[in-house]
Amino acid sequence: MRLAVLGAGAWGTALAIAWGQHHPVTLWCRSRALAQRIHTQRTNERYLAGPVLPPNVRVTDDCATAIGDAELVVIATPLAGLAQTVATLAQTAPHTPFLWACKGILPDTQELPHEIAARVWSETTAAALPDHGVITGPSFALEVAQGLPTAVVLASHNAQWAKAIIDTLHQPRFRLYAHHDVTGAEVGGAIKNVIAIAAGVAEGLGFGLNTRAALITRGLAEMGRLAEALGAERETLMGLAGMGDLILTCTGGLSRNRRLGLLLASGEPLSAALAALGHVAEGVPTTQACVQLANTLGIEMPIAQAVHELLFTPGTSAEAVVEKLLARDPKFEF
């Protein structure tokens, strides 16, 4: 299958490397200078240093060229770039099926990625929306690029199409599972970043593994409440897109959002912490969006609320937020 991967950050590069072992892949990079360096050096030193692009992968800074005759387009930009990339795809190849690999909720509109894609598509072209879906789950880019065993979910409203795609792209060390619950898969991929910030804060303050386990479990409950309120299935959150991604992001050393929490616990202001990361931390805008959604829908998300207060209320300390969270009244677990 001929693939176009749009976005040459860590995740886009990792997908190009993984699928480029067996399929022709064109990797689109917005920066001409970076595209030329990746093409020449066969590695992305800026975003994913070390892993080497296989011969099947070519690199370009021309998005239309990348899309070209692709049989499947994979959008691997940050969430903020999804709308523009979908619009380009709608104008360039309106009949080509596509996936997105970004996670989060748009703060301005509280839209999930599939809602952004559908809206932009209808605003851009009269053509019917082709088959599409999300790829998500517990997957650090570096480990995927290194060929370490990884399992993710491909969720689409067209489950038969999703199954056909995973039959083509599935590899022993990059396992794909089909799913029909797009909303549930996207909620899991979004909210786990918020909970990971909380887990990083707790770790940075010196709390133990009991605390981490409590945050993961109660974070899963918040994730499930939001997903159900949006029409998703709670069972989805018990799989790779929910619990799997939540565990990885709250515990893994490569987690940007967990590292952000560690920096905030040390007293770093948000702007300095984000600058120190050097990469996008989707948990920050997602925290803002999910709290707005929770308020609108009338559901309780106390961990997300606590993270929101730490991120967006000037002068709030990590210690104060934790004490407020721990002072909540006891209640039934379910």
Predicted regions and their residues:
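Internal alpha-helical scaffold of NAD(P)-dependent oxidoreductase catalytic cores
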Residues: G81, T92, I116, E123-D131, ...
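Alpha-helix C-terminal capping/helix-to-coil transition sites in glycosyltransferase folds
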Residues: G68-D69, I191, M243
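Rossmann-like NAD(P)(H) cofactor-binding subdomain of soluble oxidoreductases
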Residues: L53, T60-G68, L72-G147, I165
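NAD(P)-dependent Rossmann-like dehydrogenase/reductase catalytic/cofactor-binding core
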Residues: A199-E203, E228-M238, G242, L246-F334
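NAD(P)+-binding Rossmann beta1-loop-alpha1 motif at the extreme N-terminus of oxidoreductases
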Residues: M1-P51, R58-D61, T88
